[in-house]
Amino acid sequence: MAKRLWIACALFFLCAGAASAQDAKTVLQAAQKAMGDVTSIQYSGTGHLNFFGQAWAPNAAWPTTNLTSYTKTVDYNSKSAKENLIHSEPTPMVKGGGRPFAGDDKQANFVSGQYAWDQPGAAPVPQPGAAAERQLQIWLTPHGFLKAAMENNATAKKQATGTEISFQTGKFTVTGTIDAHNMVTKTETHLPNPVLGDMLVETTFSGYKDFNGVKFPTTIVQQQGGSTVLELTVNSVNPNPGLNISVPDSVKTATPPAIKVDTKKLADGIWFVAGGSHNSMVVEFPTYITVIEGPLSEARSLAVIAEAKRLVPNKPIKYLINTHSHFDHSGGVRTYVAEGATIITQEMNVPFYQKAWAAPRTLGPDNYSKANKEANFLPVKEKYTLMEGNRTLEIFHENGSMHNAGMLIVYFPKEKILEEADDFTPDLPDVPAPGGIRPAVFIANLLKQVQALKLDVATVAPMHGIVVPFSDVQKAAATGKG
């Protein structure tokens, strides 16, 4: 009897799965018929583009820019896409981070199969780390979703808003909704993010219209991490334009750049750790090490941790000072928790990190997710001092920052060294200085804080760029550049 019951249950679930797949096929075929089956598509419009991970405060929206021109061309057969856009800073200036620029910022982004690259000028710039997401974005478009669902044994489930279709492509699960009119109204998936873990990416489609026999939405909104990254009003659609992309040889042969660590001693027991786009500092105390800044990723943090242990052997890393919550400056912080360090950050960041770090990390597990440790925080309100033996390090909340509400700066009174992040980036040889109004605003506030706190600064150690005398900051503030 028990055996017959087990067989009956197995047959029930097998049949239910087959029915779900069959239902999905029927729904997808109806949607393809209603929307029009295409091999490629091009759509253009205007709207807003947001700087992901650069919110002014935890849980605030990503800072927005004006998207004055946007065209995306997708070829589904060759799994290729080209994205051309122009965006500009809004007026008045918005709070938050993001790459500063003056006037119009033009971008050309490509993906073809396993290769991704940008083309800001004549020479392509390989972007191997972007290939997986850009490829996935092809299947998050309405027609791309239908094609990928048909090819990947999708399943169907009835919901109040329509039929939910789900399928697996590689390690990613993609889900979408098809409404009663057979239109794709939403697609969603998750991407790995060093701060947010398995991060929800949700794209909604509305205002469908007929463009030369093909139905396409006139409003597209994509959110990542719960906040909008793209809001597009579509004004032109070209079905089946074709897309002939040839992957440049330099892109085919490109490999991810090796992580470099270039260390400069600033004073006894104080080192500036550079070698990439973001810097850190290693500070020796009599019985422990403090590291300032855990940017980018776990890989970067592991390299800095190894360097800290080389510089100061046989001492534990007790503290990691996180200057602010922007993702490029906090992507490697969790690695220090796994190392056993306490995280010093402005108090407003603590609830944000606690919530973000509790999210699942099935797509990109890191050392902290494997360590089974609880994160310890030392929240800073306005000032906190680390003092042991002859070493004194002062941490201040930078009030009035338009870049980040929880910005911290670090000062060494004996050595007259100031650490700062994103307020001032020294000019580098052969690298154009950032434009726009934001650098001038940020540097003016930094100088105001230094004066208000009566800090006697001789040297500035920035988290981008090179170590410079404080007089460079004063000159930049006087000329309105930063």
Regions found by a protein language model. Give the residues of each.
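Sec/Tat signal peptide C-region and signal peptidase I cleavage site
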Residues: G17-A21
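Flexible, processing/modification-adjacent segments and terminal tails
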Residues: Q22-Q29, K33, R99-M183, T189-M199, ...
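N-terminal mature ectodomain segment of secretory-pathway/periplasmic proteins
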Residues: T26, K33-A123, E151-T155, E298
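Gly/Pro-enriched, hydrophobic low-complexity segments
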Residues: A160-D249, L408-P413, E420-A421, P426-D427, ...
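Zn-dependent metallo-beta-lactamase
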Residues: E231-P286
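Conserved beta-strand hairpin/beta-sheet module of binuclear metal-dependent hydrolase folds
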Residues: K264-A308, M407-P426
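Active-site metal-binding motif and surrounding structural segment of the metallo-beta-lactamase
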Residues: A299-I344, A452-V457
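Divalent-metal (often Zn2+) His-rich catalytic cores of metallo-beta-lactamase-fold enzymes
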Residues: L447-G482
